[in-house]
Amino acid sequence: MRLQKAPLVTSGLVLGLLGLGNLLKDLSLTLNAVCGIFAFLIWIHLLCTMIKYFNNVKEQLNSPLVSSVFTTFFMSGFLGTTYLNTFFSNITFINSLITPIWILCLVGIMTHMIIFSIKYLKDFSLENVYPSWTVLFIGIAIAGLTAPVSGYFFIGQLTVIYGFVATCIVLPIVFKRLKAFPLQTSIKPNTSTICAPFSLVAATYVIAFPKANAFIVIIFLLLAQIFYFYIIIQLPKLLKEPFSPVFSAFTFPLVISATALKNSLPVLMFPDIWKGLLFIEVLLATVIVLRVFIGYLRFFLKKENQDKFLRNASQ
């Protein structure tokens, strides 16, 4: 059966799957590989769609919502290098591609951020602001999370510092927008991206800075968990809505929040009770990613629903 076109926001699911695989890596290398394979297959489908329907891609990118979410396409590339390093580092040719791919993703995400900023900040409108602006402007911090793969720890450290400052600037603007112009019901899942930036900074800090300061780790983790539970409280209501590709917004934020907790605990030496919280967060992230993944498979097989979303996305 022929699969329907993949909307650009599909990259959010790819990122979520890759992040989940790395989150589960210590538990099972097989699960890590399975997540990577599914992510790669969906990424290939997305890439083929982008090439074949390039004009439609340009139309979708005219939407500030879709364009801000598309940052996850480049973020997926960063995480993809960790899979190449894990499973193919012994193959000389593939190993030689890891750092160039990492650099290409860095250039890509910076270029996308600059183009978006020129387009939407020059004539700023609060109505063009979406929660996924946090991903757009802070997503580059994932360079620090993957710094061990490229070896560019200094760049990773700069992105962590930038990510924290940018989060402090962007989040208040996002909340102001949500108060002045509440999101339409159909795109409310995008709200879940609010918990991503501080979690990404927290998860990245202990990786990019080998000698992480415990006090800073506590501050970052506390902020990350506060926004995480802010979203978790809303999650049951958000999940009641009919499935839409915007559900991809649920995946990476929950995964990176669990990753932030996982990365921070060894540094903080907290009591074992915190491992119970980690288990719950990992389990929840796994369930949500699986649900969204299944939803996408069904979506790709239903042309009517797919065409409706693409029309809305290009508006």
Stretch-by-stretch model annotation:
Residues 1-21, 55-82, 102, 118-145, ...:
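Juxtamembrane helix-loop boundaries in multi-pass membrane proteins
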Residues 21, 29, 38-44, 175, ...:
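Membrane-embedded alpha-helices and immediately adjacent juxtamembrane helical segments
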Residues 22-31, 84-97, 145-157, 205-216, ...:
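Helix-coil boundary and interhelical linker segments in multi-pass alpha-helical membrane proteins
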Residues 25-90, 99:
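Membrane helical hairpin/interfacial module
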Residues 31-44, 94-110, 154-168, 214-226, ...:
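Structural signature of hydrophobic alpha-helical transmembrane segments
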Residues 41-52, 108-116, 167-174, 229-233:
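Membrane-water interface of transmembrane alpha-helices
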Residues 78-88, 95-119, 144, 156-163, ...:
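Hydrophobic, ordered structural segments
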Residues 104, 133-228, 233-234:
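Generic multipass alpha-helical transmembrane bundles of integral membrane proteins
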